[in-house]
Amino acid sequence: MLLGASLVGVLLFSKLVLKLPWTQVGFSLLFLYLGSGGWRFIRVFIKTIRRDIFGGLVLLKVKAKVRQCLQERRTVPILFASTVRRHPDKTALIFEGTDTHWTFRQLDEYSSSVANFLQARGLASGDVAAIFMENRNEFVGLWLGMAKLGVEAALINTNLRRDALLHCLTTSRARALVFGSEMASAICEVHASLDPSLSLFCSGSWEPGAVPPSTEHLDPLLKDAPKHLPSCPDKGFTDKLFYIYTSGTTGLPKAAIVVHSRYYRMAALVYYGFRMRPNDIVYDCLPLYHSAGNIVGIGQCLLHGMTVVIRKKFSASRFWDDCIKYNCTIVQYIGELCRYLLNQPPREAENQHQVRMALGNGLRQSIWTNFSSRFHIPQVAEFYGATECNCSLGNFDSQVGACGFNSRILSFVYPIRLVRVNEDTMELIRGPDGVCIPCQPGEPGQLVGRIIQKDPLRRFDGYLNQGANNKKIAKDVFKKGDQAYLTGDVLVMDELGYLYFRDRTGDTFRWKGENVSTTEVEGTLSRLLDMADVAVYGVEVPGTEGRAGMAAVASPTGNCDLERFAQVLEKELPLYARPIFLRLLPELHKTGTYKFQKTELRKEGFDPAIVKDPLFYLDAQKGRYVPLDQEAYSRIQAGEEKL
């Protein structure tokens, strides 16, 4: 009887709310009935129906708005224009560094000045312009102004230097580069290798001798530019907005394509799913060259009229003071930041704020409750997603440790799945029919999302590099003939459909809030070590988020000038990409296809009791690699050694 009532409830929801055809409803009910497992199904239904209905309604609302924007060819600048009309004099952005407040009208005028200036310099719809600067209000105004003209912004990671920076600038085919004065030295390092036709503009303090020749000071030029809205470009909702550089799965940073619909979808799902309000004030200390800071954070300002406080960089000691000063109600985080805050000594300010929600990803289950209780934050809004992925998740009901959920009852509504993979090679495991095998509750698997290019919520826009796209797409995943996006991440689903992040697979790992490409680091280290075989991988360190980089180097003699090596690394790699641990061994074992076998290396880690090869770690205070003995290992395990 209860099972019948449950099926009737599903029937009504599927037909009246989701408006699915009768055939699909019928087959779904039959499948649910046959696979329900009796009381187990009833238990899952009772515990999750409220969550699933809310999630379904959020998805329907966003789908309806996306469909409307698609039909009316609305773009982010057009949507922002309607926000300006609603709140012209409301504060849009606050830059903490200078306490600069911009209203929506001021942001609109600044971005229009950018569009008119670039148009006068010959840039047109479809061209690319790069932005290379630290967080501040102008960062938002620059890419928004470019979007008003139809120019696609390439948002460059400010940690990149030399080869990686040059790679991003050249592959983007940018016609212009706007860099902050704080980035001048990095631009000078690659200037000789840049295309001579690339127009250079510097924003911020002006020192002619500190910038490359032919560089122009942008700020006074924008003041003289017209502030009216330029003619609208022929852009639609699924056209390119900007590029965010990500390490992807292999090699140098790749330009992930962000179209207008993707920007809207990511911001809207967070807004409606976590019940945000137009009068919320967001504290955004995440990099604006990443999707979390620029889409999830800034998107609430541009699309929903919220005020966003921008900080140049995260500061654990100033975090709560800033929240109090600006009356912030929502704070953004990555898991590492939460740990830094917990490591701070208790102080009055941490309980005098008005923060009601912490929004982000990567908060470990082990510190989740401690974080929310110590700082009195009622809602932890954890989500999962990547710039280019089509299978974002949201933990809408604050289930401790979960990064999201998918309905066990109506799983077909949101076509994502965990599929079995080979633990050593991370290759997809397929059944006799050639289709990927779905994981059961409690079984780790790679998260995949079905690709439907005609659906803005299911499409995969990918990268500028087509070769990179091919590595992220698999065929015959849900059924024969389909395509799915491969996240490269291992998750686990429990009986109720909650999903928990387990590991980052493939050729990347996450450290200090950044994705580290092992292939890129391996190439750099090998070049510095006279082309020696080098395998780079991530290892777990107690008390830290993500995985610390470790490099196994083939050194038959065991000799290596580690002091010089550390000095050169400072110039070659950003801080988060430098290996924390080194292992010198006679040779590296390879597969038949000449790939390094990293599984055993990862398992052995950096424990000198297990690893008999010479081990070293990067001493943060000395700035060089020192021997890793049992005493140092114990300090690291106890969290007494700063990494």
From Swiss-Prot:
Domain of life: Eukaryota
Chief site of localization: endoplasmic reticulum
EC code(s) of this entry: 6.2.1.15, 6.2.1.3, 6.2.1.-
Additional detail: SLC27A4/FATP4-mediated fatty acid uptake is associated to paramaters related to insulin resistance, which is associated with disturbed fatty acid metabolism and homeostasis, such as obesity. SLC27A4/FATP4 expression is positively correlated with acquired obesity.
UniProt keyword annotation of Lipid metabolism present: yes
Membrane topology: Multi-pass membrane protein
Localisation per UniProt entry: Endoplasmic reticulum membrane
Medical condition linked: Ichthyosis prematurity syndrome: A keratinization disorder characterized by complications in the second trimester of pregnancy resulting from polyhydramnion, with premature birth of a child with thick caseous desquamating epidermis, respiratory complications and transient eosinophilia. After recovery during the first months of life, the symptoms are relatively benign and the patients suffer from a lifelong non-scaly ichthyosis with atopic manifestations.
Similarity comment text for this entry: Belongs to the ATP-dependent AMP-binding enzyme family.
Membrane-crossing residue ranges in chain numbering: 20-42, 139-156
Listed GO biological process terms: establishment of localization in cell; fatty acid metabolic process; fatty acid transport; glucose import in response to insulin stimulus; lipid transport across blood-brain barrier; long-chain fatty acid import into cell; long-chain fatty acid metabolic process; long-chain fatty acid transport
Top EC class, one word: ligase
GO molecular function terms attached to this record: arachidonate-CoA ligase activity; fatty acid transmembrane transporter activity; long-chain fatty acid transmembrane transporter activity; long-chain fatty acid-CoA ligase activity; nucleotide binding; oleoyl-CoA ligase activity; palmitoyl-CoA ligase activity; very long-chain fatty acid-CoA ligase activity
Any one GO CC term of the record: membrane
NCBIfam families according to UniProt: PRK08279.1
Tissues and organs where the protein is expressed, per its UniProt entry: Expressed at highest levels in brain, testis, colon and kidney. Expressed at medium levels in heart and liver, small intestine and stomach. Expressed at low levels in peripheral leukocytes, bone marrow, skeletal muscle and aorta. Expressed in adipose tissue. Expressed in brain gray matter.
PANTHER family noted in UniProt: LONG-CHAIN FATTY ACID TRANSPORT PROTEIN, LONG-CHAIN FATTY ACID TRANSPORT PROTEIN 4
Entry keywords, A to Z: Disease variant, Endoplasmic reticulum, Fatty acid metabolism, Ichthyosis, Ligase, Lipid metabolism, Lipid transport, Membrane, Nucleotide-binding, Transmembrane, Transmembrane helix, Transport
Record field: catalytic activity: a fatty acid(in) = a fatty acid(out); (9Z,12Z)-octadecadienoate(out) = (9Z,12Z)-octadecadienoate(in); (9Z)-octadecenoate(out) = (9Z)-octadecenoate(in); hexadecanoate(out) = hexadecanoate(in)
Biological role stated in the UniProt entry: Mediates the levels of long-chain fatty acids (LCFA) in the cell by facilitating their transport across cell membranes. Appears to be the principal fatty acid transporter in small intestinal enterocytes. Also functions as an acyl-CoA ligase catalyzing the ATP-dependent formation of fatty acyl-CoA using LCFA and very-long-chain fatty acids (VLCFA) as substrates, which prevents fatty acid efflux from cells and might drive more fatty acid uptake. Plays a role in the formation of the epidermal barrier. Required for fat absorption in early embryogenesis.
Name of the featured protein: Long-chain fatty acid transport protein 4
InterPro entries given in the database record: AMP-bd_C, AMP-bd_C_sf, AMP-binding_CS, AMP-dep_synth/lig_dom, ANL_N_sf, Lipocalin_CS
Binding site for AMP: 243-254
Keyword Metal-binding included in the entry's annotation: no
